Amino acid sequence: MIYDVAVIGAGQAGLAMGFYLKQKRLSFVILDKGSKIGESWKERYDSLKLFTPRSYSSLPGLSLEGEQNIYPTKNEISDYLIGYTNTFSLPIQLNTTITKLAKVDERFILSTNQGEYQSKNVVVATGPFQQPNIPDFSKHLSGEVLQLHSSEYKNSRQLIKGTTVIVGGGNSGAQIAVELSHESEVFLSVGHRLTFLPQDIGNKSIFCWFDKLGIYKANVNSKVGQFIKNRPDPIFGFELKSQLKNRSVILKSRVVSADEKNLFFDDGSSVVVSNVIWSTGFKSDYRWIDIPSVVDEKGALNHQRGVTPVKGLYFLGLPWQSSRGSALLQGVGTDAEYIFKQL
């Protein structure tokens, strides 16, 4: 069978794409390497809560149930994605890993561990969270030091007794630092000045105000969009700020090297560590795409709002694909609708 559209990835981006594809009489399939819908959310750390409230944490066509000003947990989102799939009867093939994507004439050939698929169009919705981005010098740490990427961290029971350094100043690193500060000596290493924003202003989520002010939907090419994009993300909430003030979490500068049980920082200081949590984000890996002009020599994608120079090939779920909201649950629906209209 030759599908009209093959979607690669059944996370929030792929499911949002599926919602719109259901609006047309198109044959399509959503392929995902996972064994369950919502699996990647379930695997995140136990205490994870979104920094967007329920009112800004749903996909097109189905609201996230519950008090709309409350911040949902990771398990709520996982369950929501399962319900979303069932509500719209989306055709998903799980346990399917794409090993190669090629184009022959006017058809795309998707080679997978489950056999070959063919499609007239392909939407790559694997998102940005593909491979943990851990610096090479981490290999210089002793095997006695426990190292975890933030995607592997679940709770404090995984850690060994002693000092913990969390590397990375995003919201995940901030949440983990606050959580661990109640149990052990914690250092937080960041390469930029931290900025903090309240989660709520006047009993409304700050994202409600972002929306009203045009910040949430600021186009990536606008002056506002470029200003926000080129600055580190703020930390939402003031828990970490309080912990830094009372020294429950000790702030360190950027980690530059490691040796045995020591981490070295760019201010010349060092810390003897027992645990390191690399909250350093992810990097993309598109080596499986065997189509010229899509990925450059540095691994960057060639696209405009997810539309590539290759007819019929699209991307979805990228940070700043069109706006600040592109990386968020609610925002991905806007990008999915745009791609849908290009088909």
Describe the role of every protein-language-model region.
Residues 1-34, 38-40, 69-171, 175-343:
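Flavin (primarily FAD) cofactor-binding/catalytic cores of flavoenzymes
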Residues 53-68, 219:
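Glycine-rich flavin
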Residues 46-50:
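A structural motif shared across PLP-dependent enzymes of the aminotransferase-like
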